[in-house]
Structure formats: C-alpha cells, structure tokens
C-alpha cells in the first residue's frame, strides 16, 4: 500500500532549496537556505537540522557557515564515505561577488570546517546533485556564468545595493547589460573518490541576443541509464525541461534539446532506482509549481509510464531534492518559499 508521510521541518520568513541526506550514523540531515524574505537577499543564510527518528522530528536550526556578513546559499550536500560536504555560494546579497565555498564535516554534519573554493568553479557557479556511476566515477553537475572579475567589479560598482521598484535588491539576473551571452553546464568528474576533479562542459546554452532568454537558472540533474549513457535535465523557462546526453562517462555532451517534460521553470530532481528505473521529482505543469509529482521511466527516460501526484496542496512546491532507500523516496521540498517539508513516499 502506498503511503505519503509529510512532516514540517521548519518555517521561516524565507526557506529555499532544502536538501536531505542520510548520515553514516543513521540520522538524517536537512540543509536549507533560510532568512530574509526573498532571495537573493543580504540576510540569506544556510542552516542545518538533524533527525534521529527517520524524519518524525527535527532539531532546531543551526548555522552551517560562520557569520561573516556574506549572504549564503547551498546547492548540494554530498557524502564521500563518512565525510559530508556542503557546496555553498557566498555573495553580497545580489549574487554579485559570487564565490564558491566547500564546507566539510567528519561527524555527520554536527561541526563543519572550511575547505575553501571549489577548484575550477571558484566564482559564479552552482554545484548540483552528486551522481556516482556504476564504475565508481563521481560526477558533480554544475552551472556556471562566465562573469569575468572585471565585470564582477563593474556590477558591484554600478548596481551594488541598488533596489528594484518593489523594494527588493537588484539581482544579477536583473542586470540589463551584463556582459555574458551563454550559460555553461557540465560536470566535474572524479575518478579517485572525490579527491580531485576534472571539468567537462556541455555545448554552451545561449542567452540574450536573439534567444529571448534574459537569464536561466539551469540547475542540472543527472541519471545514469542502463547502457551507461548519462542524461542531464535542466530548467530553462515556463514550458519544458531540456535534455543533454553523454555516451562517454561525462566527457562530451550532446546539444540540449527540449525533453517534452512540462516544467514551470523549477529545479527537477532525477533519482536512479536499484531496479534500473529512473525517478523524476518535479512539478509536471508548464505554468505553476503545483502539483508535486513523481514520474518513473522504465525505458531510459524515453517515456514515463508511471505518473503520480505526491501532493496537490494548493501552494507552490519549489526545489525538490532527495534520495531513494528501502522502497521509499526521502524527499525535501519547500512549500511557498516558507516551509521546509520532509516527505517519505513509498513506491
């Protein structure tokens, strides 16, 4: 019998992109951006929560990155044996002066130390959900915006602290004359368990100019298919997800094409299942982030025969993440950018 168990982890003035993972001691950790009333904003910070009863109850929020005046965002929490790494973004509150930062924990996420910037993706980049391939290779998908240091300084000088008519700070995606014309998506590939990485990029995804795209938050997610191919999905705009594939373990990628998967410009999450099927957690709607859906493919993402609604509660479900374990999906999600939810959904 299918069951859906939904628990409230935390409510804040803003909650954004919670990420749940199983720790080596059996506990669960949830990491989420919280604080301020929108994002990006100067008072965005990243907190963690623990659960020792499989998600029935959660600890109070604890700051993950030590306070230094920077706005902070987290885009991935990855396990490497008993070590946990949180991939953070530090910025001025507008995604200017945007720098990567890796935080590491060897005690299941209770204390954290700073490892510095992620080599090769030091600035204007998000690191996304880790995928370990059947051969042991590790892939970290990324999105990167080719903003030079000169352009970064110009943005700070001209637009730092500038506010929009609605009172919110002007974000990097709002700048009309930013000097970039594409977004880089790709993977960081490790063959030594995550000790070192090499960067491999997809064909550039053009923005601005004749594309009609002012900016995209691509937020790539990966799945390994039955024949060893790797599929990547990205969000582009309110219509459909886009797809690229690699046939050589992530070194080269096909050009992105529409995937015929409706999406309201919201992060999707692919999860490989032990039986070879591929699960996709997303909002299967081209206009709004509702309902929260689970699609499952048994033919390497050619079709999605299983299409289920996890919840159609009439508010926005934003930025799903999670993992599979013992017949259930462990899902983290934000509701209406305020509530951090934890969901156990049986398959």
PLM feature spans:
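Asp-box/BNR beta-propeller blade signature and adjacent active/binding-site loops
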Residues: 1-347
């Amino acid at each position: 019998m299918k069951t859906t168990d939904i628990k409230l982890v935390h409510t804040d003035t803003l909650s954004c992109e919670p990420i749940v993972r199983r720790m080596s001691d059996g506990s669960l950790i949830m990491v989420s951006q919280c604080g301020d009333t929108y994002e990006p904003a100067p008072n965005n910070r990243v907190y963690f929560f623990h659960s020792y009863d499989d998600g029935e109850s959660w600890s109070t929020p604890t700051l993950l990155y030590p306070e230094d005046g920077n706005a902070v965002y987290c885009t991935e929490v990855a396990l490497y044996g008993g070590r946990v790494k949180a991939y953070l973004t530090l910025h001025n509150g507008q995604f200017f002066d945007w720098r990567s930062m890796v935080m590491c924990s060897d005690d299941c996420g209770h204390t954290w130390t700073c490892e510095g910037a992620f080599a090769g993706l030091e600035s204007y980049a998000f690191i996304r959900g880790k995928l370990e391939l059947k051969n042991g290779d590790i892939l970290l998908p990324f999105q990167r915006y080719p903003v030079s240091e000169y352009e970064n300084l110009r943005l700070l000088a001209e637009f730092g602290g500038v506010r929009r008519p609605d009172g919110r700070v002007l974000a990097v995606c709002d700048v009309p004359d930013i000097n970039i014309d594409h977004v880089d998506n790709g993977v960081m590939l490790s063959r030594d368990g995550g000790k070192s990485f090499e960067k491999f990029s997809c064909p550039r995804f053009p923005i601005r100019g004749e594309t009609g795209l002012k900016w995209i938050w691509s937020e790539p997610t990966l799945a390994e298919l039955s024949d060893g191919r790797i599929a990547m999905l990205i969000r582009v705009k309110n219509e459909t997800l886009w797809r690229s594939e690699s046939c050589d373990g992530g070194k080269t990628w096909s050009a992105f094409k529409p995937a015929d998967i409706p999406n309201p410009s919201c992060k999707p999450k692919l999860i490989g299942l032990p039986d070879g099927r591929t699960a996709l957690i997303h909002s299967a709607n081209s206009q709004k982030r509702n309902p929260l859906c689970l699609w499952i493919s048994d033919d390497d993402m050619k079709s999605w025969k299983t299409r289920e609604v996890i919840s159609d509660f009439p508010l926005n479900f934003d930025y799903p993440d999670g993992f599979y374990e013992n017949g259930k999906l462990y899902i983290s999600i934000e509701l209406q950018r305020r509530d951090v939810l934890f969901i156990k959904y049986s398959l």
